[in-house]
Amino acid sequence: MACGSTSLWAGETSWFCCGSSWGPCGSTGTGACGTCQSSRNMAAWPNLTSACWNVTNPAACGENMPRRGCGSVVNVKHQCSGATVCVTLADCGPNTQMWCSEKTCCNGVCRTHRVIDLTPAAYSAIGSLSSGLLPVYIYE
């Protein structure tokens, strides 16, 4: 899995559960792509498909995010610590339109709008699950 360095987006990330029981997660569905597992470095993207876009509606927050499909790989970098994790897109989410005014800051720079959700395995690679939200840069 190649992880790129070309800037794609920036915003907030949170974490979510999918697939088999693992860590803080009980067993749940395997996501829009049918492959999502909490124990693997995976993510949910709000413009996975047109149906996904219509539900997550990032445009309501002024986010015109590019379409990236199931199996696409992106590199997520914690804005504060510089820690990175390479993830495979495996689900639709987060529901960006619900978080338009939310922001997370560090080092005097704030990121707004939840633009990617990470599985617990991926989120733990760049921050503590207890933090709940992290400001991130996304590369491909």
Where are these regions (language model features)?
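Secreted/periplasmic proteins
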Residues: 1-140
